Amino acid sequence: CVHPQFRSGKALSMLWLNLVPKVLWSMRAKYVMGCVSIHLEDNLARAYYTHRQIQQLADHQIIDIRSNRAFEPERPEYSFPQDERMPKLFDTYLGMQSKLSKQAFYDEDFKCLDYFVFLEINKIATSFVMNKMVQR
């Protein structure tokens, strides 16, 4: 988990630019897995539309990991255009060629939906790290 104050594209870039070459390659890691979350509290419309978009992802963007506490967000009574956009962190992970689970795990403690994320180190290196290093 990353503290909300540091959840930005710049912070994520710094994490991956340092984590991949310095830690993961030295460990000879092949894969990284974790989760990406969307808060439900005062955010039901965004959670609903994000969940819908994840259901529409291509097969190469999906990993079949099922949750025993799956959660299906209900369609909101109203929403704003910004609610219909997938959160940037989800887009970033998809841009890194990661795979997401279609099912969301409902985390009662944090009041959020967690989607499983699976990344191949070689894909991170080619699609994200090298691209960011060239941009420096």
For every predicted segment, state its role.
Residues 1-98, 108-112:
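Acyl-donor binding region in acyl/amide transferases
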Residues 88-90, 100-135:
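C-terminal/domain-terminus segments
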